[in-house]
Curated annotation (Swiss-Prot):
Relaxes both positive and negative superturns and exhibits a strong decatenase activity. The keyword Nucleotide-binding applies. This is Type 2 DNA topoisomerase 6 subunit A. Its EC number is 5.6.2.2. It comes from Pyrococcus horikoshii (strain ATCC 700860 / DSM 12428 / JCM 9974 / NBRC 100139 / OT-3). It is an enzyme of class 5 (isomerase). One of its GO terms (molecular function) is ATP binding. PROSITE patterns: TOPO_IIB (PS52041). InterPro entries: Spo11/TopoVI_A, Spo11/TopoVI_A_N, Spo11/TopoVI_A_sf, Topo_VI_alpha, TopoVI_A, TOPRIM_Topo6A/Spo11, WH-like_DNA-bd_sf. Belongs to the TOP6A family. Homodimer. Heterotetramer of two Top6A and two Top6B chains. It holds the Pfam family TOP6A-Spo11_Toprim.
């Protein structure tokens, strides 16, 4: 199986004016309702599992159409209503001035005592963060497009040229540490791409191993290290590399329920961010490993780890890894027969297999045999 760059499927162009217009349209609506003597309100798409579904056609986890209405003249709603307007004004200022703020900065910048009262606008960041998520769903824009960022996590390494503001550089010439993916990647451009595909790797240790073994150069790929669950910035970057630049996406995680869920969020989206699946998920992604089949295929029985928790057939079970496996067995997006088989084998054997277990063969085994062989022969899970 030869992986190669394909024709781009979409072209993204960040336009701050569109974000400003959506903010202003919503603000004008509230103002007109107040001026006409009506009770101003926001319609907020409802969060939670009961408003999430798996869309078979798009192959994405999506948010349903349930709404909750938040009124100004309602004692139960008034505080959140005020907080929403405060953050809308703050975001408008950020976007207009071309500045960015972290979630923490957004909280502190807008925390103050309401004049004439002893009431604070925000008591804790746990109040401001959900309002920003509400605005994402109400406006249909990413938090990052509103110039609100989170801590950066993850890095990339490979022969692509990145344009970040006034800076332009090749991600294979920044040392073995690569380029750290920022919290927002909306402004990033890719003037030159000289790789055939993207290999997304769960652990930094495995990504470092592949870089040391010259895998990106030899296999002509871009390494994306997620360093655990992929951040929004990393997921958005993967999405853009596939849809805008036509690069196939291959994911490589530990063979356990958490590694498989990392793959699931990259491919299908997540329950918590179902409203952003269309912009963050990449349903064409494929999974190379680790799998339960790898244990037998590569004689790794002696380097497996026991699943954590209590099995379903024991008193108090299932808990831990076992509980997570059963949840995944029941998710609509894990119903493919190959995935069902992998999950059931993990339950039956009661083991997990880490990426680093391949070092039992040799340090270079993963880069020179395991990955090239599986990708070349198309041994990939959907």
């Amino acid at each position: 199986m030869k992986l190669k760059r394909q024709k781009p499927k979409e072209k993204f162009s960040y336009d701050p004016q569109k974000v400003l217009k959506k903010l202003e349209d919503l603000a004008w609506k509230i103002l007109e309702e107040a001026k006409s003597g009506k009770n101003p309100y926001f319609d907020v798409p409802t969060r939670g599992l009961n408003n999430v579904y798996f869309d078979e056609e798009s192959r994405l986890i999506r948010l349903g159409d349930r709404l909750s209405r938040r009124y100004f003249l309602n004692v139960a709603h008034a505080r959140k209503f005020m907080q929403t307007l405060i953050l809308m004004a703050y975001i408008k200022r950020l976007v207009s001035e071309g500045k960015h703020a972290s979630l923490r900065e957004a909280y502190y910048a807008n925390k103050h005592t309401v004049p004439g009262t002893r009431e604070n606008t925000f008591e804790d960041q746990s109040e401001s963060d959900p309002i920003i998520e509400d605005l994402e769903r109400m406006l249909g824009v990413l938090r990052e497009e509103m110039h609100i960022t989170a801590d950066r996590r993850g890095y990339i390494y490979g022969d692509i040229v990145i344009k970040d503001g006034e800076d332009e550089f090749n991600a294979s010439k920044l040392g073995t540490g690569g380029w750290a993916v920022p919290g927002t990647v909306e402004h990033i451009q890719f003037p030159e791409i000289n790789v055939d595909y993207v290999l997304v790797v769960e652990t930094a240790a495995m990504a470092d191993r592949l870089i040391e073994e010259k895998y990106p150069k030899r296999e002509n790929c871009l390494i994306v290290a997620t360093q655990g669950q992929a951040s929004r910035g990393v997921r958005r970057l993967i999405h853009r590399l596939h849809y805008e630049e036509g690069l196939p996406i291959i994911v490589f995680t530990d063979g356990d329920p958490y590694g498989w869920y990392i793959y699931s969020t990259i491919k299908r989206g997540s329950i918590n961010l179902a409203y952003l699946s269309e912009k963050l998920a990449t349903p064409d992604a494929k999974f190379v490993g680790m799998t339960m089949d790898d244990i037998k295929e590569y004689n790794l029985e002696n380097v497996t780890e026991k699943l954590k928790g209590i099995p379903p057939d024991k008193k108090g079970g299932p808990t831990g890894d076992y509980k997570r496996l059963i949840e995944e067995l029941n998710y609509p997006w894990f119903q493919d027969k190959e995935w069902q088989r992998q999950l059931k084998l993990a339950l039956k054997w009661g083991v997990r297999i880490e990426q680093q277990a391949l070092a039992n063969k040799s340090l270079e085994f993963v880069a020179k045999e395991y990955l090239p062989e599986k990708i070349r022969e198309g041994k990939l899970l959907p």
